[in-house]
Amino acid sequence: MTKSLLVCIALAALVIGGPAYSQEAPPPSDQASAVKALVTRAAALIEKDGKTAAFTEFRKKDSEWLHGDTYLYAYDLKGNVLLNPAFPKREGTNIAGDKDAKGKPFQDDILKVAAAQGSGWVSYMFPKPGQTEPSEKWAYIKKVTLDGTSGLIASGFYPK
């Protein structure tokens, strides 16, 4: 009887206390649906046309990929920034360990989602393009193969 109780308690703890980053998801919204669809289409384009051709498309201003607050970014799974047309100075840098304005290691969470789950959501505080003050942001991440190397493609939205 005691063993059964301990097993039940252990199982309940696992269900309730699973990895925090895998439990995140934004409230259902048109913004969240649009970002998830955008990332899914971007991953398909990378798979179909390859990294170089896809990244050329993702950098085109006023396209479905880059307009207003909407942009795609790509990292390898070590945290090297391969694409970020909204913040081009970040390209070629490593973001592993970067924290948001509240001290959350959000970049590590993004890398973990891609590596461990293949896709998912992460929330964090980040400035909108052209601004310096952080705002709440939700990012949808999807693991992809970038010219034979594992990486991720992502985009996000700032809730209205």
Region spans (language model):
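N-terminal membrane-sensor/transducer module of prokaryotic signaling receptors
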Residues: 2-11, 15-160
